[in-house]
A protein has these predicted regions:
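Short helices/loops that flank or line small-molecule/ion binding pockets
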Residues: 14-21, 149-160
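Structural recognition of the beta-strand scaffold that forms the well-ordered cores
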Residues: 24-28, 47-48, 101-104, 163-166, ...
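Extracytoplasmic substrate-binding proteins
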Residues: 38-110
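Alpha-helical, coiled-coil/dimerization segments enriched in small aliphatic residues
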Residues: 113-146
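Solvent-exposed loop/turn segments at secondary-structure junctions
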Residues: 30-33, 52-55, 106-111, 169-173
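Acidic/His-rich segments in extracytoplasmic proteins that coordinate ligands and/or metal ions
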Residues: 1-68
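Structured C-terminal subdomain patch of bacterial secreted/periplasmic proteins
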Residues: 67, 158-193
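Short helix-initiation/N-cap motifs at beta->coil->alpha
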Residues: 6-14, 141-152
Length: 193
């Protein structure tokens, strides 16, 4: 039986969740509040993030979710298999070794600010699985959240990044390259986005 996945952008639909009669509610990678946790717990056991919202790394997510579903051995095997696959695939990209990277979100309609996913965010943390590291300017940013908003005037935080990872396409790269501030970032100039 396939799990039911809910879009929670407009809040949790407790009635729909209850109607699906879940055995367990998986929210290891979520931002549920204590109040939401308490309400969901009235429906079924809830696996919530252990420390901070949106900061449960993928290995921990798999382990927690698999354990909650009574499939701990399968979860451990999946983590091991994925680690082996990552190692196998990254072996083909030795030129990434020693490079720094930053995972960002840019809105092409408003390049006056952007967001950096911090090393505690699973998307950003995955970059280290690929053999990349974070520039010192990013590593020393606060870790209370999974991301931080940066004004384009503070673009210097990206100057040491060899690679920028971002959601978007070639149009985003063109917009970044033609922006007066963002276009000065070496990774943007070099097309390493």
């Amino acid at each position: 039986e396939k799990p039911v996945v809910y879009d929670d952008i407009d809040g949790l639909d407790y009635e729909a969740i209850s109607d699906s009669n879940p055995d367990v509610i998986l929210a290891a990678y979520s931002g549920i509040t204590q109040e939401e946790y308490d309400l969901l717990s009235q429906i079924a056991p809830v696996v919530a993030y252990p420390k901070n919202a949106w900061q449960t790394l993928w290995r921990e997510q798999i382990t927690m979710d698999a354990t909650a579903m009574g499939k701990q051995a399968e979860g451990e095997k999946l983590v091991k298999d994925l680690d082996a696959l990552i190692k196998e695939k990254t072996a083909n990209y030795t030129d990434l070794k020693g490079k720094t990277a930053v995972f960002c979100y840019f809105n092409p309609a408003d390049l006056g600010k952007f967001y950096i996913y911090l090393p505690t965010d699973p998307r950003a943390a995955y970059l280290t699985d690929l053999g990349l590291s974070f520039p010192e300017s990013i590593s020393k940013l606060g870790a209370d959240s999974f991301s931080i908003e940066i004004s384009a005037e503070n673009i210097d935080v990206l100057k040491d990044a060899d690679i920028l990872v971002a959601y978007g396409n070639d149009d985003l790269l063109k917009a970044l390259q033609s922006d007066a501030l963002l276009g000065t970032v070496p990774a943007v100039k070099n097309g390493a986005v």
